[in-house]
């Protein structure tokens, strides 16, 4: 987050008037030529298919509210922009705000009714939780921990591509932590499953919020130990060892995947180490 603290997550009271508003639906945000933040009272007069409203924080000291819509209604002079576009380009503080808002919107949408008894859930004002008034079930915003790892072998790195990637792009390996395992155990298991090799000497590098839709990426470097690359069917389209001076197209600069690669390059060359965004 930038030093000015332009964005701070929080829970502004929806009973209060005024403030800014974001309109969100299906991981897309409403935008016009002036940006994404609309005067809240004006936006609420636009006859939007409002599903829920949540206070999500403050932008430059002003309260920000999320209007979660039932469907992405088209409005003159406005367009719906996918969240991922803000991750790739523009103001990173703004992306942090949108990523948080998107996760809150999806959580609220998915927890309108109690999964235990079917009663409509209620948002509690003093903390970010949905509560069932019938059976007292509490549902907090979902967070899915996931490891992401750069496997190294001297001046080579192991990179892979999924069928879902942009054509030609290779990245680090990643996978969700399963119940009952540590993140370190997840690294070893996922590398073995995805490419068939064994790793050791894990080094934790850092973490990054990844709101697509609700992951927390925990980044590692790991050293190759043994095994030949065998890509996991249906998950890995291709995996190869790449020399540091002959790398393929890589992930976006702001991603933790790219940071893991750039950090290793800097360390091998003696250059200044990059800073992980976010």
Swiss-Prot record:
Residue intervals of the Nudix hydrolase domain: 141-265
Gene Ontology molecular function, alphabetical: magnesium ion binding; manganese ion binding; NAD+ diphosphatase activity; NADH pyrophosphatase activity; RNA NAD-cap (NMN-forming) hydrolase activity; zinc ion binding
GO BP field: NAD catabolic process; NADH metabolic process; NADP catabolic process
Annotated positions binding Zn(2+): 114, 117, 132, 135
Keywords on record: Hydrolase, Magnesium, Manganese, Metal-binding, NAD, Zinc
Highest rank taxon of the organism: Bacteria
Reactions it catalyzes: a 5'-end NAD(+)-phospho-ribonucleoside in mRNA + H2O = a 5'-end phospho-adenosine-phospho-ribonucleoside in mRNA + beta-nicotinamide D-ribonucleotide + 2 H(+); NAD(+) + H2O = beta-nicotinamide D-ribonucleotide + AMP + 2 H(+); NADH + H2O = reduced beta-nicotinamide D-ribonucleotide + AMP + 2 H(+)
GO CC term (a single one): cytosol
Binding residue positions for substrate: 84, 127, 140, 208-215, 257
Known EC number: 3.6.1.-, 3.6.1.22
Position of sequence motif Nudix box: 175-196
Sequence positions that bind a divalent metal cation 2: 190
CDD domains for the chain: NUDIX_NADH_pyrophosphatase_Nudt13
Positions annotated to bind a divalent metal cation 1: 174, 194, 235
Cofactor binding: number and manner: Divalent metal cations. Mg(2+) or Mn(2+).
Binding site for a divalent metal cation 3: 190, 194, 235
NCBIfam families: PRK00241.1
Annotated function: mRNA decapping enzyme that specifically removes the nicotinamide adenine dinucleotide (NAD) cap from a subset of mRNAs by hydrolyzing the diphosphate linkage to produce nicotinamide mononucleotide (NMN) and 5' monophosphate mRNA. The NAD-cap is present at the 5'-end of some mRNAs and stabilizes RNA against 5'-processing. Has preference for mRNAs with a 5'-end purine. Catalyzes the hydrolysis of a broad range of dinucleotide pyrophosphates.
Subunit-level organization: Homodimer.
Family: Belongs to the Nudix hydrolase family. NudC subfamily.
Annotated protein name in UniProt: NAD-capped RNA hydrolase NudC
Gene: nudC
